[in-house]
Amino acid sequence: MTRILGIDPGSQRTGIGIIDVDESGRSRHVFHAPLVLLGEGDFAQRLKRLLHGLGELIETYQPQEVAIEKVFMGKSADSALKLGHARGAAICAVVLRDLPVHEYAATEIKLALVGKGGADKVQVQHMVGIMLNLKGKLQADAADALAVAITHAHVRATAQRLGVNTQQAWSRKR
């Protein structure tokens, strides 16, 4: 059994999703939640909260692998920079604990879950719910984090079948 932590980074809310994957490649939901950073003071204090909060979750749930969504250029350059800082704080929390980090673009995640790189958030949330047998509507940030974890589980299973590392498997899938 392998435990995978998925992270959907954000400067106001960071999605956290944790799954267990068995030897056959089946995924089981363990935990999901948004790590809310608003109200934590200035931006630097929010990054500190992200670093420490994510570190606590890693210590509690003990994942073996971590997958994180790559930065995309959104509304403005300022937003993209803040997202990059949040992503950096999240990656630091992971590598400080000597865990491997695997990165996936939003289009790669959508392709892995829905079959279309241009799928919308509702389609991704729906597929996450089906794949993990979750009832009710998932909160967007947490659903995205679970989607990142599921994507990594799929890439990981493909890599094992091909006898290559995950980076090589993903480049062959596309």
UniProtKB/Swiss-Prot annotation:
GO cellular component, one term: Holliday junction resolvase complex
PROSITE patterns the record matches: RUVC (PS01321)
Keywords: Cytoplasm, DNA damage, DNA recombination, DNA repair, DNA-binding, Endonuclease, Hydrolase, Magnesium, Metal-binding, Nuclease
A Pfam family it matches: RuvC
SUPFAM superfamilies referenced in this protein's UniProt entry, alphabetically: Ribonuclease H-like
Entry's Gene Ontology molecular function annotations: crossover junction DNA endonuclease activity; DNA binding; magnesium ion binding
EC numbers for this chain: 3.1.21.10
Statement: the UniProt record of this protein carries the keyword Translocase: no
Main location: cytoplasm
Domain of life: Bacteria
HAMAP family (UniProt xref): RuvC (MF_00034)
Family recorded in the similarity comment: Belongs to the RuvC family.
Name of the protein: Crossover junction endodeoxyribonuclease RuvC
Organism in which the protein naturally occurs: Xanthomonas campestris pv. campestris (strain ATCC 33913 / DSM 3586 / NCPPB 528 / LMG 568 / P 25)
Gene for this chain: ruvC
